[in-house]
Amino acid sequence: MFAFVEQRYPTLWPYIQLMRLDRPIGTLLLLWPTLWAVWIAGAGTPSLTVIVVFFLGVVIMRAAGCVINDFADRNFDGDVERTQGRPLATGALSAKQALALFGGLGLLAFGLVLFLNELTFWLSFGGLGLAVLYPFTKRFTFMPQLFLGAAFSWAIPMAFAAETGEVPEIAWLLYVANVLWTVAYDTEYAMCDREDDLKLGIKSTAILFGDADRLMIAILQALTLLALIMVGHRLGFSWPWYAGLVGMSLSFAFQHSLIRYRERWPSFHAFLNNHWAGACVFIGLYFQYF
């Protein structure tokens, strides 16, 4: 599909690249926990409106997040092997064009949230703020992954607000679980760029953890599973939910086989594998309510 766009509409291609529409992994990593929240908040039968709005919102806000991230990193991406081909780094698009695209995506997201209730509307501003803040945190903290986790998890309280009109305690427990998971998988992602980031003075948990990176990832993944077990216990879930968590744990084990030598591309594939971890949890959740 995207090869056709690149050949037929070459002027659109840099915008697609900037929004990462050709690389859906980020959308999937944002989508799975959003669906967890939507399904739990709706007790297995969420509103179709909520499903559609949050699905489209995930696609739009992930695209917007990529745009503002590349805008923030435009002076660094050309010096990092993995990001040298990004449109702002190559000059295919200007900073002004990126900001205009970000504004347009923000307006689309704003239009979507108008279909939901007032509490969800006000919560959406928190999500926007976190999305804008995250890319710039790499300049002043070794924990930008924590800010990414906060941003990537914000759809969880929003989903509960949209379905139930409130944000109960269980929503925040699910939020914490997803923040922990996000920090774990984005540390794997940061391992790919560690050498380049050290040269450029860019901060990350991969640099902060140093030789303890694999241990810290394992601890974060274990805490993720513990938090999700607590979610299941509080909701009275049975074997389908826990079977999904077994699937997630097997995915985590496979990832550790990939990152054992801390090589760039195996670490990237470990990051990609998290899509299956999130999918396992949702499949278990779906059959829990089936």
UniProtKB/Swiss-Prot annotation:
Pathway, per Swiss-Prot/TrEMBL?
A: Cofactor biosynthesis; ubiquinone biosynthesis
Q: Name one GO molecular function term.
A: 4-hydroxybenzoate polyprenyltransferase activity
Cofactor(s) annotated in UniProt: Mg(2+)
The alphabetized list of GO BP terms reads: ubiquinone biosynthetic process
The protein's location, in the record's own words, is: Cell inner membrane
**Which Gene Ontology cellular component annotation is one that this UniProt entry carries?**
plasma membrane
Topology class, membrane: Multi-pass membrane protein
Catalytic reactions of this protein? all-trans-octaprenyl diphosphate + 4-hydroxybenzoate = 4-hydroxy-3-(all-trans-octaprenyl)benzoate + diphosphate
Q: E.C. number, please?
A: 2.5.1.39
Main EC class the enzyme belongs to:
transferase
> What HAMAP family does UniProt report for this protein, alphabetically?
UbiA
Record's function text: Catalyzes the prenylation of para-hydroxybenzoate (PHB) with an all-trans polyprenyl group. Mediates the second step in the final reaction sequence of ubiquinone-8 (UQ-8) biosynthesis, which is the condensation of the polyisoprenoid side chain with PHB, generating the first membrane-bound Q intermediate 3-octaprenyl-4-hydroxybenzoate.
Q: Which family does it belong to?
A: Belongs to the UbiA prenyltransferase family.
Q: What's the protein name?
A: 4-hydroxybenzoate octaprenyltransferase
Organism the protein comes from: Alcanivorax borkumensis (strain ATCC 700651 / DSM 11573 / NCIMB 13689 / SK2)
